[in-house]
Structures are given as C-alpha cells and as structure tokens.
Amino acid sequence: MSFLLLLVGLGQPVYGQYTSIQDTARCLSVRDSSATEAFGKNTDRQVTAYYYANKASLVDKYFRRGMSRISILNIPKGKRPAPESYLKRRYIRRHLKYFKGGASCIVSKAMLERYDGDSIGKADNSQFIMTKAEMDSVLTKSHGDLSCIEHELGIPSGAWKHRVLVRIDIPKPKKLRLRMASGNEVGANVLWLPGGLLPTGYREAVIDRIPKGKYKASLIVLTGEVNDGLAVPNKNEQK
C-alpha cells in the first residue's frame, strides 16, 4: 500500500494512508442489487434525461440578451469571453454558493504522486471541481463502475481505463479563487458547456491549483479492477 505525505488540518505534516472509498449504498443486499439492476438502469436513464434537459433549460434564461450556449461554443477555445460577460450576475453568485459545503475532483494516483502531492491542477493554474455533495452522489450511484463515473463527470469514455483514481476533497474552495469556467482552461474538453453545468447536469466550477495542506486524498475502489494490488470483485459475481 502506498503512502503519501500530505499536509492536513492546520498545516501539520502527517503520513496518511489513502482512505478507500467503496460502494456506500450498503442498505441494498447483493441479491437486491442484481435483481433490480436492468430495471433500475432503464428507469434512471429516462428520469435523469428529463431532469437534465429541464435543468439546462433553466440556465438558458440567465444568459444575457443576444448570448446563448451555442454562440459561446462557436467561439474557438482560447478566445471565449469571461462568463461574467454573458451570464447574469445573480446566477453566478447563486451557482458558486453551492460550493460553500466543499468541492471535489478526481485525479489519477500516478499524477498525484509524480510531484509528491505538491499541488494539483493544470499548468494554466486551473482545476475543474464539482460540489462535494454531488461527488458523494456520483460515487454512490456508480457502485464502483468506472464507465458510470466517466459518464456522470463528462469524461470521454475509456479515458480513465487502467488508472488508479484518487478523490480530492477541498474544504474551502473559495480561498483558491473559486470561479465559473470560461471554457479556455487546459482541462476544458469537447464536452464542456457554458453555464457551469456538466453534460449530465452536475454543477462545476474552477479553482487555482490546489497546494499541499488544502486537500484530502482518498483512494477510489473500482469493481473488477486492481488497486494497489487488491482486486475488488464485481458485486454481481459475489455469492
């Protein structure tokens, strides 16, 4: 098991072992989960598709006159305007308030340890985040299924295959210049949408690179994958 020197709490250095995050929906037995899997997936797709469509349409009314998601997406990456120029101020304030309870993101363990956990983020001093509450929801509903995690977070399918993933929690993102994403960030991919929502409807924002002492790292356990030499069997294969 790997160890990583982290600075936590009030900046006191401690040697901390990664905390493993497994399926938190323990109220369901394996038998119950297997029996309802197909029905649950079909129903979930129908409900969430309707929910996301309505959530996105609510954002549209907060674009300033003459601006829209399509008009912003038609501008090449690197030249897109600041969100404040096309989104109403009250919407931005309300959107960022959701991050008051903390923020989270996912990175690869290899990337984190490459620089000894010194800081997390892209070369342009940016890191995409979502609310801690919604990250909890994503990891709970995914049941350790990597493809589900990728889909929910707007990550191209297979991009994280064969990687050991680490959840990063940031208790106070506001202190790291919490802001709306412009779409010019290095981490903005082809699935990025103006307005602060992922394609699946979760809220996102951007902060500066996260230094030591400002985050907590937890290992994500995936079903059917090997993490640090420990194989985690698929739930449906358990007896």
Each predicted region: which residue ranges?
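Long, low-complexity, intrinsically disordered regions
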Residues: 16-127, 136
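Bacterial Sec-dependent N-terminal signal peptides
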Residues: 1-19
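Catalytic toxin/effector domains delivered as secreted proteins or via bacterial secretion systems
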Residues: 78-238
